[in-house]
Structure formats: structure tokens, C-alpha cells
Amino acid sequence: MKYCHHCASPLVQRVPEGDDKLRYCCDSCDTIFYQNPKNVVGTLPVQGDRVLLCKRAIQPRLGKWTLPAGFMENGESSLDGAIRETLEEAGALIKVQKDSLYTLFNLPAINQVYMFFRAEIINLDATPGFETEEIGLFAESEIPWDEIAFPVVRSTLEHYFQDLPRKRFPVRMFDVHHGEDRSITTHVISHSHHEY
């Protein structure tokens, strides 16, 4: 990359403030160009019957609640990325079982794949990162359902609380389709039957 896609100024390579990776940056309009795989990975961290959610301090969906998740970095596995994002966004140390993949969402309209892994919270004493305004542990009845940031997060939470009484957490894979009115529908394309 040589020029900014937004203002056509020359790009420079540097490590942006608050980052630890070399990025293409535009010093004219302050745009940072992230060259990441289009895989979003995160966890569904639990402590007892409560789920850890993060209130977003950044766009998109500023002020809305989400599971800790973000883009994978080059050179890391999906599980390693999910664990990293959970520590960065929620300040939580977690334990993840080897068969912990829980939901996978294909979003062909935006060329992204979202993966969420079930995780047990080991330590919640760390400070959340700059992308998170606050964190909270919520039982099902306490979740701010109308303030959930993304449909894939809502779907993951709904399935988790549906599965929790049976202690069976099958892996579910979905195709997500965007309608002309910006509505989103999911279609289950795979459903495993593992007991944990």
C-alpha cells in the first residue's frame, strides 16, 4: 500500500499509539489500515451461571454490550486470538477446554467469519482495555437484551442459556444474511451433539 484510500496522501509504516504492530498509517487524515484476516474470534466467558459482557467504548455500537471479541492477528490461531481478545477487552484470564468452539457465523455480505468459544473465568482482577467502557457479569434475567451490540452475540447468548439447563453445548454454525432493510436472518447449517 502506498496511498490512503480516504484522502490519497502517501502512507507511512509505524506502530500507532496504543498498538504493538507495524501498520500503514495516513498522517494527513489519521486513518490506520489494519491488514488482518477477516476472522473475528471471541469467547463466551462464564463464572457460575453468569456471563461476562463488555460495554463498548469504541465504534461501531459505542455504549452497547458485547462478548469480548475482535479480529485475529496474523500468526495466531483462532483460539489464541479469542483468549487474547478476552484479556485485552475484559481483563479476564480464562480457561478453555479443547472442544470449546460454540458458535460460528459466516457473514458473506461483509466477508467475515465470527467464532465464539466457551470459556471459564479464572481471574477477573485485571483492568479492561481501552475498547471497553465497563464489564459486567450477568445472569440470563439481568442481561440488557435491548442493548446487545451485534446479532451474532445475541444469538450466541440465547443458545447458551437454552443449552445451560441440559449442560449440553453443541457447536452451531450459521449463515447470516443481510436484508435490503438492514435486517439480519440466520440459517443453521450445522449442529453437533456433544455433551460436556
Which positions does each model-derived feature cover?
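Acidic, metal-coordinating catalytic segment for phosphate/diphosphate chemistry
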Residues: 1-43
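Small, basic N-terminal interaction modules of short regulatory proteins
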Residues: 2-6, 92, 179
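A short linear hydrophobic-aromatic micro-motif
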Residues: 13, 53, 99-103
